[in-house]
Amino acid sequence: VNVLWLQSGGCGGCSMSLLCADTADFPGMLKAGGIELLWHPSLSLASGRELITLLEDCRDGRQKLDVLCVEGSLLRGPNGTGRFHLLAGTGVPMIDWVRGLAAVATHVVAVGSCAAWGGITATGPNVTEACGLQYDGDRPGGLLGAGFTARGGLPVINVAGCPTHPGWVVDTLMALAANLFGSEDLDPLNRPRFYADQLVHHGCTRNEYYEFKASAEKPSDLGCMMENMGCKGTQAHADCNTRLWNGEGSCTRGGYACISCTEPGFQDPGHPYHQTPKLAGIPIGLPTDMPKARFVALASLSKSATPKRVKSNATADHVVVAPAVKKTRLK
């Protein structure tokens, strides 16, 4: 399976993350999966006329293109011309190259939230007219249009995240190479379900604090960050706390609130990332699938039953009260 990777309007963070894939032999891993990387801006030597010839060959059908990966948002400005971002040496807007290559690719993959929805590049007034491949924020459309399907029959596969976990990208490419990826493997936002059917909350090491609604009050506190610190882990679709980053970490494990970076529009939440917006003292963003009345009732009951150990540790930066030592055997 031939893979062509292009970078558009973004920081390159998804590529940097990919280079941290949990393997000692990244090229060997791709080869074992039957993946040939035609070109990647950080991993390939080709440039100038050699690269342009490759892109022309892919676009014109002389080189088979199985998977087109696009990293970074698509810059349509000014006034829809795309001339804010010209591919070096061609004088042609990147959006025109992407349209032409997407039309002949068997599959198209948006790598990261910028390529999927517009992401950070589309923040605020969006003067660059940035959008995703098939979404403009949470609205279907984007550069290629809501009705786009690649030659393989699938819409754009949105491997969203800022940045993406290297495993999300590699697993997607491996599944495509093995012909084991179909429409049933996409969630309603066309994200791969193998990671999007989970919540960041799943596997969070702060779950005991969440269960008792023992909340952190400031950075470095051990407690749950949902109530006060802006954490959206109970709403964000990703497997960050079960897959982990570099085999051992995640945002919440590092003491940072989840900002739901796999979600369209995460870059403009309408409030500071580190604060939880509330109405009458109740967080506006309640856990996925949790009715407000039930959450309020559960929170009240949980707080009334909070052990002293959990309550004390929640607002400390280290364990101040250790679990009691008790016999667990029946006799």
What does each model-found stretch correspond to?
Residues 197-325:
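Long, compositionally biased charged/polar accessory segments in the mid-to-C-terminal portions
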